Amino acid sequence: MTFLQQANTGVQALSPYQAGKPIEELERELGISNIIKLASNENPFGFPESAKKAIQNQLDNLTRYPDSNGFSLKAAIAEKFNLQPEQITLGNGSNDLIELIAHTFATEGDEIIFSQYAFIVYPLITKAINAKAREIPAKNWGHDLEAFLAAINEKTKLIFIANPNNPTGNFLTEAEIDSFLAKVPPHIVVALDEAYTEFTAKEERVNSLALLKKYPNLVVSRSLSKAYGLAGLRIGFAVSNPEIAGLFNRVRQPFNVNSLALAAAEAVLNDDDFVEKAAENNRRELKRYEEFCQKYGLQYIPSKGNFITIDFQQPAAPVYDALLHEGVIVRPIAGYGMPNHLRISIGLPEENQRLFDALIKILNLK
C-alpha cells in the first residue's frame, strides 16, 4: 500500500496549487536578468515605507510569540471600517480564511457552490475536506447568481463568490449581491471574497460590510496582499457576525499570523496615499491594456481587478513560453479551464510597455 492510498480521499484527488513563476526560478532556468513579473497580481510599487518602519520596530521582539488574538490590528480594522473587533478574524492571507470558512461549515457529503472560472482555491479546499463541488457554469465569464440559487438544495452548506472575480475580473454590483443574499436560505453561509475590491472605482464599490447588518450568514474576506503591498507577509481578514467569528476562532491555528505581518498590516491599513497610488496606476494602465488589445485585435475580458485576461484564440502556452524568454512572467490559466488565455497583472507603465513590445514581437502584430 502506498502513502497516496493512505491519504485522505479528498487529498488523493488533489493536484498541487500552481503559483506564478518566481523571478529567481526563471533566472536559474534561462540565465537571464532584468525580469519583470506580471503574474501574481502584486502591488507594483513595492513594499510600503510605513510597513518597513513598523517591521523594524518589531525585530527585537521576535523571540516572543505574536498576539494570538491580534488585538491591536483588530482594533485598527474596526476603527477604519466602523466594525466591532468581535466581528473580525485574522488570517495568514485570505487563502487561509477561505480554508477556515470551509473547514468550519462543510464536511464530507456537504455541497459547496462556486462558479466556473472562479478562484481555484475554492475547488481545492472543497476536495480536501471531501465535500461535493457544485461548479456553476459561468455567464459571460462571471457568476450566474440565478443558477447559483437554482443549485441550492438540502446539502448546500457554503457558497463562494469572488468580487471582482479572479482570474476573469468580472464584477457584481451591490444591487446584484443584495438581491442574491435576500434569496439565499439564512442557514447557508455566503463567503464574499473581496481580495481586489480596492481596485474598483469608489463609486462602484460594493458596501459589503453594511450588508453584514442585513445578512448574518454573510462572511466578507479581504486581502492585504494586493493594494496594500504585503503579499510576502501573508495577512488578510474576514468580517462576519460575532457568532461566526467565534466559530472561526475554534478552528484557526493559535498563532496563524506572525508578528511582522501584524505590525505591518496595522501600519499600512491607514496608508491611504500608498493604496490610492496603486489604484490610480491600475485605472490608468488597465485602460492602456484595453487600448492595446483593441488596436491589435486581441480579445480580452473587461476587468475590475488589477489584472487583465487576454484570449489568444489558440493554446496560449507557446505565447507564455515566448514571453519567458523575453524576461516577462505572466500567468497561464489552463488549470482554470482557460487554455487559450493568459492573465496579466497590471504593472508600472514601463513594465506594461515591455509586455506590449514583447507581444508585438512574438505575435508579429501589425
Swiss-Prot record:
* Pathway(s) where this gene product acts: Amino-acid biosynthesis; L-histidine biosynthesis; L-histidine from 5-phospho-alpha-D-ribose 1-diphosphate: step 7/9
What is this enzyme's catalytic activity, as reactions?
L-histidinol phosphate + 2-oxoglutarate = 3-(imidazol-4-yl)-2-oxopropyl phosphate + L-glutamate
Q: Can you tell which superkingdom this protein's organism belongs to?
A: Bacteria
The UniProt entry, under Gene3D superfamilies, shows: Aspartate Aminotransferase, domain 1, Type I PLP-dependent aspartate aminotransferase-like (Major domain)
Q: What's the top EC group for this one?
A: transferase
Q: Which UniProt keywords apply?
A: Amino-acid biosynthesis, Aminotransferase, Histidine biosynthesis, Pyridoxal phosphate, Transferase
Which NCBIfam families does the UniProt record give? hisC
Protein name in UniProt:
Histidinol-phosphate aminotransferase 1
Q: What species is this protein from?
A: Mannheimia succiniciproducens (strain KCTC 0769BP / MBEL55E)
